[in-house]
């Protein structure tokens, strides 16, 4: 590769590398307060307080045996009930909430992706997942509802996308998972909320490739 072409590569790809580095530097700064809360009618609420990136709970709660390994990814503002395993031998309704406060980005009009996967052996049961942004930065706040996903299917994956105008910071994210047992069985669940990635990096990459093509044509003309 000639020196001119090498310089062109550096100039074309440089903005993409810089943008990626800036994103990683900003994303790695997330270390915010978050809480996991379990509730069922007739039982005292259980709350676990932590700091990103993880929170967990394991043991008996209400009419359920619970194992939750959740939290937030530190690479972007994402909250995740990533491994939620439940079992019960009686009917019951369990609510699981996860919330993070102190988020500073992204801002402006943002699309948010909510995802839910369900695998259970409890015929007649149902699971729902609600997501929300709260611009008052309140833990478990649901000021701006995003998506609601629900199903009575034993094996299914669901997703929903909704927009929210992040007009002020800091703000909070909240997930509310509701599990209704019809009489006994096991549940393996996963719920998450994260911003939909913007195509900015793809635009930069496209610009870089166009620049390389232009340099290549110019070099061929000079030969």
What are these regions (language model features)?
Residues 3, 7, 11, 15, ...:
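Residue-level marker of intrinsically disordered, low-complexity segments enriched
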Residues 2-33, 182-210:
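Short, threonine-centered small-residue motifs that mark membrane-proximal processing/anchoring sites
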Residues 214-223:
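C-terminal membrane-anchoring or membrane-association module
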Residues 30-195:
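Helix-boundary and membrane-interface capping/anchor signal
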Residues 5, 131, 199, 222-223:
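Intrinsic disorder/low-complexity segments enriched in polar/small residues
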């Amino acid at each position: 590769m000639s020196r001119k072409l090498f310089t062109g590569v550096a100039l074309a790809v440089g903005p993409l590398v810089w943008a990626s580095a800036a994103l990683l530097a900003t994303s790695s700064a997330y270390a915010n307060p978050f809480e996991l809360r379990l509730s069922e009618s007739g039982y005292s609420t259980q709350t676990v307080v932590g700091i990103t990136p993880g929170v967990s709970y394991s043991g008996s709660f209400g009419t359920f045996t619970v194992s939750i390994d959740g939290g937030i990814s530190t690479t972007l503002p994402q909250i995740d009930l990533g491994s939620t395993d439940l079992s019960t031998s009686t009917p019951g309704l369990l609510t699981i909430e996860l919330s993070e406060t102190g988020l500073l980005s992204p801002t402006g009009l943002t699309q948010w992706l909510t995802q839910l996967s369900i695998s259970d052996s409890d015929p007649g049961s149902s699971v729902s997942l609600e997501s929300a942004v709260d611009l008052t930065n309140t833990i478990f706040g649901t000021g701006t509802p995003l998506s609601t996903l629900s199903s009575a299917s034993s094996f299914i994956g669901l997703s929903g996308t909704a927009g929210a105008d992040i007009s002020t910071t800091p703000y909070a994210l909240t997930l509310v998972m509701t599990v209704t047992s019809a009489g006994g069985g096991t549940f393996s669940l996963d719920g998450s909320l994260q911003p939909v990635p913007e195509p900015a990096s793809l635009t930069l990459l496209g610009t870089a490739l166009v620049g390389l093509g232009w340099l290549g044509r110019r070099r061929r003309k000079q030969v």
